From Swiss-Prot:
Complexes and interactors: Homodimer. Part of the 2-oxoglutarate dehydrogenase (OGDH) complex composed of E1 (2-oxoglutarate dehydrogenase), E2 (dihydrolipoamide succinyltransferase) and E3 (dihydrolipoamide dehydrogenase); the complex contains multiple copies of the three enzymatic components (E1, E2 and E3).
Molecular function terms from GO: oxoglutarate dehydrogenase (succinyl-transferring) activity; thiamine pyrophosphate binding
Cofactor(s) for this UniProt protein: thiamine diphosphate
Keyword Translocase: no
Name used for this protein in its record: 2-oxoglutarate dehydrogenase E1 component
Superkingdom of this protein's organism: Bacteria
Keyword Cell membrane found: no
């Protein structure tokens, strides 16, 4: 008997949950117990009861003409439909996915539903009634249940029910239910897999015995991580992927380096012995890092395909590498050689992130990075996440490290499919890897593999884990390795015999011994002890002429003030832009935002791409930039920098999510992988940048010294004390200055639009060279439109960036100057504004002011040459608006002492030490600021001093 044609049997198109709904509606129709869907009511009136027919089979699998009307089994049908969906949704709760535990058991929701249905009930229901795509050989609902339990409750378990897209969800279920993922491997691939596991285990055990007590953070217990990465990398290569980016912590890193990235064993052993070996490529900076933090780049290939694999350098700050590697991938995906936005091709590269089971739910950077995955400015076409799940974080059990059942549960909130797999089932692990790469390449979205194993030793090899997990480690001690388990399986299946397995083991051991024999004795020469900064770094950025011809600037400005005909610019913005029309003419003045746009355009015309991101970067936090215009009628956007002539480089400016750490990491990674690009991150206020402090500490400031990893990232950090309270005043320059050493970056606080123009162009000029380094700018807020920060066209068309500037009209009588005031940024402008105001009388002949535009590296020669002009100088004073324990004072003090020598005093004027960067009372702030200025200029003026704390001292 065959299924009726759907033209005469409309019920044939209803299956699964839809079928259950139809049957419920028919029951209501017959009993009159409730309202029925009008369309279904019409079908019931025409065709009668839902009727389902399937092939007739005999024996135990009998399934005959079946209708709720002639069987009275409506409730049973509904229960079967519900059971099928429960197996799909909750089968993972019964699966054997933890090698250290028995398969899940006990009365679960699933088991209760199964107990309510007898085998006879299930045999009476045709398979396709509840499973439309039931494969051949599946005839009854009983067959369906057996098959789905086999799929969903073994060593592979799936969580797909949270996926919102029905097409994706259907594809995932079809992939796992069709059994195409679990096709038997060829004997050749099985043998290769055993060899790989033997190499991984042999390598770890060799290190364990040869370098006793040395830290290596063994992978043992989750050995299948290496074959899983192999599978993803090579399947990606088959799909045409050119770059695979991997981010991971120290656990298992050495084995991944040795096997996935093909770092020679001999080079690994040399690092353990502290020996030099011929052919080893240095992949670290002058200070270096421990071996399990280092990365590597390698072209990986087999007989058919090849791809470049990059394992990112990584600190011990878990998961902070995640956004960095995402930035790598985006940079590799984009073509930046045309004007307009970069052209992205997500098939060119993808990311694999290896997480820890404690760190994945524990570190907030994970969630921040996951949130980037579908944002236009940051998406990379899908990341494959692998949780190397050994069920413990150092000494902390999982029940103390997360509030969820699985360590992967965070991913559900980001619509990411999840596969849990038993790390002791190698072929199941490869199936998970295969599903992950197929999904990523098809849907361009993230996928997560929860690789559940154990940790055979302690957190490191000097740690005894039995102290804190005695029962677990009794089990682990007696538990066979995955290599041994798989070897037994292959032997039982007749793929290999015992002698052949032993031959594989011996081959690996001989290779390890042979490579170890190549390693010379430890190098104890002075060269390995003394750290020397490379000359090109120590030399610093040399003076560079960065002016742009005036005619070019005028042409650029004209283009910046143009937009398509019919494009309706917001009236207020239009007025702001129109004020810039004559800025480059005689008597014109250039404000900060225009100087920036002119710098951007000129940099683009010289072939350097630009990427700028931040929480409000298109408009600018202070409504000053307006680099992306919005049509008031259509909300379409337009950026004049995309349409300027003579540009062969991309420009992108994006508003970022409310994240600092992930976005800073991403932009750093983008810049590392696209060194020719001017990459800038702008904080909404500099105060908020400290939520990315780990990125500044571990990557931006120290990446080159540790790993030889160059970056030209620009940080724009709005800074300045304006009475707006402790969260809107300070970018904490003291922290960047504390990290400043070995010419690792430039820290500047500028006082004019021209200076900003020139320093951006200087930074662009060193990109991709050995002279490159990050640029940390304390950018203005109130100074954005301040008259004293405006510049003339000639100041942009001529000259270069000046690390120090002298206050105009001061110091004209050198022999009378007694006090030299040094300051930076807004404080310097406040001093200049007070002088210009003419409110008070000063003995200006006795004062000279120098603005320190570049705090680090400090322009010592320039300042020293100024000091030498003043033969009667009595004191050098540092003036700042920040409290004494913040700002630049503690950085400047030893510099001033050295500059002053024995005969000249040094001093400080500013706020006293405080625990909070700024007060919250704007009136108190104003009074304090006036007092600081008064003392700095030595004004004989009666200020309200009774309740104000201003510190003035000299040595």
């Amino acid at each position: 008997m065959t299924r009726k044609n759907t033209t005469t049997n409309p019920w044939a198109k209803f299956h699964g949950p839809n079928l259950g709904y139809v049957i419920e509606q028919y029951d209501l129709y017959v009993t009159g117990a409730g309202s029925v869907d009008p369309e279904l009511q019409e079908l019931f009136e025409i065709f009668g009861a839902p009727s389902f027919q399937d092939d007739v089979v005999t024996g135990d699998n009998t399934a005959t003409h079946f209708s709720p009307q002639n069987t009275g089994n409506i409730e049973k049908i509904l229960k079967v439909v519900q059971l099928v969906e429960q197996i799909r949704s909750f089968g993972h709760t019964l699966a054997h996915i933890n090698p250290m535990e028995d398969a899940a058991n006990g009365q679960s929701l699933l088991e209760k539903a199964m107990n309510e249905l007898s085998d006879a009930d299930l045999k009476a229901i045709p398979a396709k009634t509840v499973w439309q795509d039931a494969p051949e050989g599946i005839h009854t609902a009983l067959d369906v249940i057996h098959r789905l339990k086999e799929v969903y409750t073994q060593t592979l378990a799936y969580e797909f029910s949270h996926i919102q897209d029905s097409e994706e969800r259907a594809w995932l279920h079809q992939m796992v239910e069709s059994n195409s993922l679990r096709q038997p491997l060829s004997n050749k691939k099985r043998t290769a897999l055993l060899k790989r596991l033997t190499a991984v285990e042999g390598f770890e055990q060799f290190l364990h015995k040869t370098f006793v007590g040395q830290k290596r953070f063994s992978i043992e217990g989750v050995d299948m991580l290496v074959p899983v990465l192999d599978e993803i990398v090579l399947e990606g290569a088959k799909n045409g992927v050119e770059d695979v980016m991997i981010g991971m912590a120290h656990r298992g890193r050495l084995s991944v380096l040795a096997h996935v990235l093909e770092k020679p064993y001999s080079h690994m052993f040399a690092e353990f012995k502290h020996a030099k070996i011929e052919g080893a490529v240095a992949n670290s900076g002058w200070t270096g890092d421990v071996k399990y933090h280092l990365g590597r780049e390698q072209v990986v290939s087999n007989e058919e395909v090849s791809t470049r694999v990059t394992l990112a350098n990584n600190p011990s700050h878990l998961e902070f590498v995640n956004p960095v590697v995402e930035g790598f991938a985006r940079a590799a995906q984009e073509n930046r050689k045309k004007s307009g936005l970069p052209e992205q091709d997500t098939s060119k590269s993808f990311v694999i992130l290896v997480h820890g089971d404690a760190a994945f739910p524990g570190q907030g950077i994970v969630s921040e990075t996951l949130n980037l995955s579908r944002l236009n400015a940051y998406q990379t076409g899908g990341t494959i996440h692998v949780i190397a799940n050994n069920a413990v974080g150092f000494t902390t059990d999982s029940y103390d490290s997360r509030s969820t059942k699985y360590s992967s549960d965070l991913a559900k909130g980001f619509d990411i499919p999840i596969v849990h797999v038993n790390a002791d089932d190698p072929e199941a692990c490869l199936a998970a890897a295969n599903l992950a790469i197929q999904y990523r390449m098809l849907f361009k979205k993230d996928f997560l593999i929860d690789l559940i194993g154990y940790r055979r030793y302690g957190h490191n090899e000097m740690d005894d884990p039995a102290v804190t997990q005695p029962q677990v480690y009794k089990k682990i001690k007696n538990h066979p390795t995955v290599r041994a388990i798989y070897a037994d399986q292959l032997q039982a299946a007749g793929v290999l015999n015992a002698d052949e397995i032993e031959t594989i083991t011996q081959f690996i051991q001989e290779q390890l011994k042979s490579d170890y024999a190549q390693v010379p004795p430890a190098d104890t020469s002075d060269a390995t002890i003394h750290v020397k900064v490379p000359d090109v770094v120590a030399k610093g950025i040399q003076p560079i002429d960065t002016g742009v011809e005036l005619d070019s600037l005028r042409a650029i400005n004209e283009g910046l003030l143009s937009w398509p005909e019919g494009f309706n610019v917001y009236p207020k913005v239009k007025k702001i832009l129109e004020r810039r029309k004559d800025a480059l003419e005689e008597n014109g003045k250039i404000e900060w935002a225009l100087a920036e746009s002119l710098a951007f355009a000129s940099i683009l015309q010289e072939g350097t791409p630009i990427r700028l991101t931040g929480q409000d970067s298109q408009r600018g936090t202070f409504a000053h930039r307006h680099i992306v215009l919005h049509d008031t009628d259509t909300n379409e956007t337009y950026s004049p920098l995309h349409r300027l002539p003579n540009i062969n480089a991309s420009f992108s400016v994006h508003n970022s999510p409310l994240s600092e750490a992930a976005v800073v990491g991403y932009e750093y990674g983008y810049n590392v992988f696209a060194p020719e690009t001017l990459v800038m991150w702008e904080a909404q206020y500099g105060d908020f940048s400290n939520t990315a402090q780990a990125l500044f500490d571990q990557y931006v400031s120290a990446g080159r010294a540790k790993w030889g990893q160059k970056s030209g990232l620009v940080l724009l950090l709005p800074h300045g004390y304006e009475g707006q309270g402790p969260e809107h005043s300070s970018a904490r320059p003291e922290r960047f200055l504390q990290l400043a050493a070995e010419n690792n970056w430039t820290v500047a606080n500028l006082t004019s639009a021209a200076q900003y123009f020139h320093i951006l162009r200087r930074q662009a000029s060193v990109l991709g060279t050995e002279a490159v380094r990050p640029l940390v700018l304390m950018t203005p807020k109130s100074l954005l439109r301040h008259p004293l920060t405006l510049s003339t066209a000639s100041q942009l068309s001529e000259g270069r960036f000046q690390p120090a500037l002298e206050q105009e009209n001061l110091g004209t009588k050198p022999n009378k100057v007694k006090r030299l005031v040094l300051s930076t940024g807004k404080m310097a402008i406040d001093l200049a504004a007070e002088i210009e105001s003419g409110k008070h009388e000063y003995n200006l002949d006795e004062i000279h002011i120098v603005r320190i535009e570049q705090l680090y590296p400090f322009p010592a020669e320039k300042v020293q040459s100024i000091i030498k002009r003043f033969k009667n100088l009595e004191e050098i004073i540092w003036v700042q608006e920040e409290p004494r324990n913040m700002g630049a004072w503690h950085y400047m003090a030893p510099i001033l002492f050295e500059l002053a020598g024995d005969k000249v005093k040094t001093g400080y004027i500013g706020r006293p030490d405080r625990s909070s960067p700024s007060g919250g009372d704007p009136f108190a702030h104003k009074a304090e600021q006036e007092l600081i200025v008064a003392h700095a200029l030595d004004v004989k003026y009666n200020f309200r001093q009774d309740k104000l704390e201003i510190e003035v001292f000299s040595n």
